Swiss-Prot record:
Gene Ontology, cellular component aspect: plasma membrane
Organism: Helicobacter hepaticus (strain ATCC 51449 / 3B1)
Sequence intervals crossing the membrane: 16-36, 44-64, 81-101, 111-131, 134-154, 168-188, 210-230, 244-264, 276-296, 306-326, 332-352, 382-402, 423-443, 463-483
Gene that this sequence comes from: nuoN
Alphabetical GO biological process terms: ATP synthesis coupled electron transport
Membrane topology: Multi-pass membrane protein
Protein name: NADH-quinone oxidoreductase subunit N
Gene Ontology MF annotations: NADH dehydrogenase (ubiquinone) activity; NADH:ubiquinone reductase (non-electrogenic) activity; quinone binding
UniProt xrefs under InterPro entries: NADH-Q_OxRdtase_suN/2 (IPR010096), ND/Mrp_TM (IPR001750)
Broad enzyme group: translocase
UniProt-listed Enzyme Commission number(s): 7.1.1.-
Function (record text): NDH-1 shuttles electrons from NADH, via FMN and iron-sulfur (Fe-S) centers, to quinones in the respiratory chain. The immediate electron acceptor for the enzyme in this species is believed to be ubiquinone. Couples the redox reaction to proton translocation (for every two electrons transferred, four hydrogen ions are translocated across the cytoplasmic membrane), and thus conserves the redox energy in a proton gradient.
Length: 492
């Protein structure tokens, strides 16, 4: 064999592809079962999905090594950031699947294709989080995004179809921006490999050319669309509103943590240049993303839209940790999002459990504040849990998100971003108003409907609510240990 064609299998390091292959294989199995299973047993599909999610998690915990590993001719990079991203993504998916098992007759959740697409999207996101090549990141992003477009539109209702089209158009625009940004960086540095780009800029004494700055701007716009940074956020609330509550929770958590992992890899290169343009641009976007959605959320009349704007604001907090760009702040990103996912899924899960399947689709996906009026009288258990999740999302001590915000502000102050820490504190106070608005409806208003609206909960939903509530409250006792585990992954 010619020398140029010879290579070692060690260069492939194919075991790095196992997490993606597990999800892909699970999706294919689901499609096969769906073809031959005439009874359309949703519980079977969910059980198979959970089996592959648990198998994936088990592999990451047992075989995952936070020390950097390269594979597939150095196109793949599996390190602590990649492993943490996949673990958070899979934990969120597992809890959401528990909620999906509750008896709910929305048509889109009955077929095998729904859960197959969910696993395919996880495979795409895992590929995206485990790459250091701008082109392969785009490949993983598009694979996952196409699955999400289909998942949203699967119900074939007007509002769902409209949400899917908006998401698709914004996604196509983001892809265009990303491709153009990658092209500019290639023109400036001769590489689409993130490490090679960083090496080139270091050799140039971090004096980026206009092409590098332009590439940064286009990539910021593209990734900003994916994590709903202001001013690229307008699609978010409409897509959340047109999706069922659990799918909205998935979109609010999984694509964002994966994209933030990519943002850490790419933007750390630009931030290390100590360019005033890069720092001021990110600073302005951080402040706008934390503040504007908070103010808009105050005026919302639908709980799902309020949670959508809340999620956008939380993205601003996480981007602040990227801007700070220290090992401590990078650890806080995953610490914050881990705590946020349980409170957020818990809140969206209760919206899911409050659906009345006998009503029309628009009523099913709409959750006006009035719907929760007097909930403490009609369903005290869910009312107390929803209140707990609102306190957690508001960052009220000692609930989970409080610790994420506290450590984030501490990181900001340590890195001399004192004003930024003050802005975070002000926005946390503003957020408290719209979260507590729902609590007032739950406790101080008369029931919206006279009839008893007690929900019949499956054991799986009770388990999911128990997990989310437990983490939201008991994190007080595991904060330090959790942060130490995350830091071990990040620092290696």
């Amino acid at each position: 064999m010619p020398e140029s064609m010879s290579f070692s299998l060690n260069q492939l390091n194919l075991q790095l592809l196992i997490p993606m292959c597990i999800s892909l294989f699970g999706g294919i199995i689901l499609l096969g079962v769906g073809v031959f299973n005439k009874t359309k047993s949703r519980d079977l599909y969910i059980t198979i999905s959970m089996l592959f999610v648990v198998l994936n998690l088990g592999f990451l915990f047992l075989e995952g090594n936070p020390i950097r590993q390269f594979g597939f001719f150095n196109l793949l990079l599996v390190d602590g950031i990649s492993l943490l991203t996949q673990i958070i993504m899979l934990l969120a998916t597992f809890v959401l699947l528990l909620f999906f098992m509750n008896q709910n007759n929305l048509p889109e959740t009955q077929g095998a294709e729904f859960y197959a697409l969910l696993l395919f999207s996880i495979a795409g996101f895992a590929f995206m989080a485990s790459s250091q090549n701008l082109i392969l990141i785009l490949l993983g992003l598009e694979t996952a995004s196409l699955c999400l477009y289909a998942l949203i539109a699967l119900h074939n209702q007007k509002s769902a179809f409209e949400a899917s089209i908006k998401y698709f158009i914004m996604g196509a625009l983001a892809t265009t921006f990303y491709a153009f940004g990658a092209m500019l960086l290639y023109a400036a540095t001769g590489s689409v490999d993130i490490i090679s780009i960083a090496t080139f800029l270091h050799q140039q004494s971090y004096q980026p050319s206009i092409l590098v700055f332009a590439g940064f701007v286009f990539l910021l716009c593209a990734l900003g669309f994916k994590v709903t940074l202001v001013p690229f956020h307008s699609w978010g609330p409409d897509v959340y509103e047109g999706s069922n509550a659990l799918l909205a929770a998935f979109i609010a958590i999984v694509p964002k943590i994966v994209t933030f992992a990519v943002i850490i890899r790419i933007f750390s290169v630009f931030i290390d240049s100590h360019s005033a343009f890069v720092e001021y641009t990110l600073y302005v976007i951080v402040v706008l993303t934390m503040t504007i959605p908070n103010l808009i959320a105050l005026t919302q009349k639908d709980v799902k839209r309020m949670l959508a704007y809340s999620s956008i604001s939380h993205s601003g907090f996480v981007l602040a940790a990227v801007l700070i760009n220290t090992p401590q702040s990078h650890s806080v990103i995953f610490f914050y999002w881990f705590l946020f996912l349980f409170a957020n899924i818990g809140a969206f899960g209760i919206l899911w459990l409050s659906v009345d399947c006998k009503k029309n689709y628009q009523t099913q996906i709409s959750h006006p504040f009035e719907k929760f009026s007097g909930m403490i009288k009609t369903n005290p258990t869910l009312a107390i849990l929803l209140t707990l999740f609102m306190f957690a999302l508001a960052g009220i001590p000692p609930f989970c998100v409080f610790w994420g915000k506290m450590y984030l502000m501490q990181s900001a102050i340590s890195a001399n971003y004192t004003i930024l820490a003050l802005i975070m504190a002000i926005n946390s106070i503003i957020a408290g108003f719209y979260y507590l608005k729902l609590v007032i409806y739950i406790f101080a208003k008369e029931p919206y409907e006279i009839k008893d609206s007690q929900s019949s909960l499956e054991l799986s939903s009770k388990f999911a609510l128990s997990i989310t509530a437990f983490v939201s409250v008991a994190c007080l006792f595991m904060v330090q240990n959790l942060l130490e585990i995350i830091e071990k992954y990040i620092l290696k």
